[in-house]
């Protein structure tokens, strides 16, 4: 079994040197991701595609490889194929008949052929020969060239024949790290998760900067969003997660700043702090989830005033998107349920926020801040490799809270996403196992029997630890992490 990875069309339009660089980077990214699934993964780059070989003795890897390939930026689509050689057009037909005969029963179909190399036949001749044979010797209802029930795709590459078993839609975009790094201001809400995803998809290593206004509980929720985005779409490269305790800034805003100017000034202080961090990390741009007119601080006038606080480039990929479209995209990329469970933390609430801030007035208000305010905030910022989120959770979860054995009064809760749980369900004889996805646990945990202890389980132990800490922050003491 092989996968043929087709490049995103915009890559194909690049000059030869750029196309080569992008393709090499995509090959490396695919290898980095698939090696985490299985060390035996083999990836081979060609001029217009990348081949991924699945070991013949490991058919169990096919689904896992397909799932990972569908989430790697830079891929238009992936063809799962059976590879063979052929001697003639009739041989191609016989192989196609053997594979598709049962699938064609009661269906209309067409045959599409792509061909590379010198042959004594044309692609359309193969389509007609194979299609005619299938129409005559199967129980298909007939050939239909437009909108058939089934399209049979064949690829002929010199002496090799590829029978397409499955076509997997890719993520599109550019390969990770072909564009410059960005620092995304992430709050855990719908907007910041989607804006981060869009830059991952466009090929930028996306680092995360979180301004903590809601304590540990807020930070745990945001880390789940960032970790999910990285693990699913950007796992090929290391990125940083920065947590900035912003309480000192909020305190001074509430004590010193005119009520109507608070929202704009809070955003300016965030941008200044993020710009300093970006400079330190050699990052060229900040990314936010702001959309024009969504809240009072996001009018064009206010956004212009916010931008004036730094020379750093500020990018807003959602600027003209409707809220419902943003939520729909968050659902597609898997962050919607995270964002739903994170409360809205608003550090400063103006009674009558300005929608037309005046730069001179804003700057005059900012003169009231302590001179060393941003320096003090930066000194307390925590910068970690996003892969260390699990390790940082370990320092907060004691050994007694992580268990490998299950007692009679304990119940295991499988917190994996439904599709992951269905692929490999957890089974333990004599043990009660509940399946509650991580994104529903916060709302459903209160309904469980409080007399029992619950052990949270996931494959890698990251989401289970984050959820355990989240519940402990809410005051639940009957929760632990299960690591068999």
UniProtKB/Swiss-Prot annotation:
Cysteine disulfide partners in this protein: 346-458
Record's keyword annotation contains Cytoplasm: yes
Compartments, record wording: Cytoplasm
GO function terms (MF aspect): ATP binding; CCA tRNA nucleotidyltransferase activity; tRNA binding; tRNA-uracil-4 sulfurtransferase activity
GO CC field: cytosol
Enzyme active site: 458
Pathway assigned to this chain's UniProt record: Cofactor biosynthesis; thiamine diphosphate biosynthesis
Catalytic activity: [ThiI sulfur-carrier protein]-S-sulfanyl-L-cysteine + a uridine in tRNA + 2 reduced [2Fe-2S]-[ferredoxin] + ATP + H(+) = [ThiI sulfur-carrier protein]-L-cysteine + a 4-thiouridine in tRNA + 2 oxidized [2Fe-2S]-[ferredoxin] + AMP + diphosphate; [ThiS sulfur-carrier protein]-C-terminal Gly-Gly-AMP + S-sulfanyl-L-cysteinyl-[cysteine desulfurase] + AH2 = [ThiS sulfur-carrier protein]-C-terminal-Gly-aminoethanethioate + L-cysteinyl-[cysteine desulfurase] + A + AMP + 2 H(+)
Keywords carried by this UniProt record: ATP-binding, Cytoplasm, Disulfide bond, Nucleotide-binding, Redox-active center, RNA-binding, Thiamine biosynthesis, Transferase, tRNA-binding
Xref: CDD domains: PPase_ThiI, RHOD, THUMP_ThiI
Domain Rhodanese: from-to ranges: 406-484
EC number: 2.8.1.4
Cleavable signal peptide: none
EC category name: transferase
Gene Ontology biological process: thiamine biosynthetic process; thiamine diphosphate biosynthetic process; thiazole biosynthetic process; tRNA 4-thiouridine biosynthesis
Residue intervals of the THUMP domain: 63-167
One of the Pfam families matching this protein, by short name: ThiI_fer
UniProt-annotated binding residues for ATP: 185-186, 267, 289, 298
PROSITE patterns: RHODANESE_3, THUMP
HAMAP family in alphabetical order: ThiI
Cited function: Catalyzes the ATP-dependent transfer of a sulfur to tRNA to produce 4-thiouridine in position 8 of tRNAs, which functions as a near-UV photosensor. Also catalyzes the transfer of sulfur to the sulfur carrier protein ThiS, forming ThiS-thiocarboxylate. This is a step in the synthesis of thiazole, in the thiamine biosynthesis pathway. The sulfur is donated as persulfide by IscS.
Family of this protein: Belongs to the ThiI family.
Identification of the protein by name: tRNA sulfurtransferase
